[in-house]
């Protein structure tokens, strides 16, 4: 009887929390490569009519990932969501996390994530609706080992750049770069570089700073260029058009990898600022030169 009462009170607390607090999960995309960053947004709306105190405990917001086919997903650690805050009634709070480092989702397939919100003041918890996503396999296009110096005279660490393409939404090809150890046993980062066409002749060169320079075709006459750091972050992205000549990678006389040919598109920050009419200087009447009558 006592167990039944405890279960009943817990169930009542769950329904109370669910009715007065909304929680929604969202992803920027639904398809990811193994080891790619999976940025999840958790939207919490307070409809209880009173202030909520959230985030004070380490386990106030927890996550669970499962494979739809029953494959066991190993949880490496709890996803950290830090920072206490007060959520007033009718207010919305958004917390953003990356699921990738904390769950082993290396097998291609369909997965879903569920978030659980623990409300300490109510001794209650509520679970979100599952958010589904897919982990897809990429096709390897190119790979190369490179060395990373650690600032000492020791032998450099050997890592590997790998370019992969994946059919995003089965409609659009996307180009990815993976940074791993030489054996590809440890993947440090997978980054999406952007869309590409099926007939793209992708060029890749590692420069003297161990950065990867990539040039690929993204449209009928458009090309994208990216520089990737040894840690997998993108240092620079430029866009070129096939006007008069096709862009290609080359090494100049200084030993730097550069883009030769094509027409580079200026970035918005490089364009001159056009002021609105109300900020333009006022028009002034032109000063006419004085004419002296020499016949007088």
Residues covered by each model-derived region:
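Low-complexity, Pro/Ser/Thr- and charge-rich linker/hinge segments at domain boundaries
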Residues: 130-158, 238
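N-terminal signal peptide c-region/cleavage motif recognized by signal peptidases
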Residues: 14-16
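Surface-exposed loop/turn elements that mediate protein-protein interactions on large endomembrane-trafficking
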Residues: 174-195, 222-241, 267-293
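Positively charged n-region of N-terminal signal peptides that target proteins for export
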Residues: 1-4
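Terminal connector regions
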Residues: 102-137
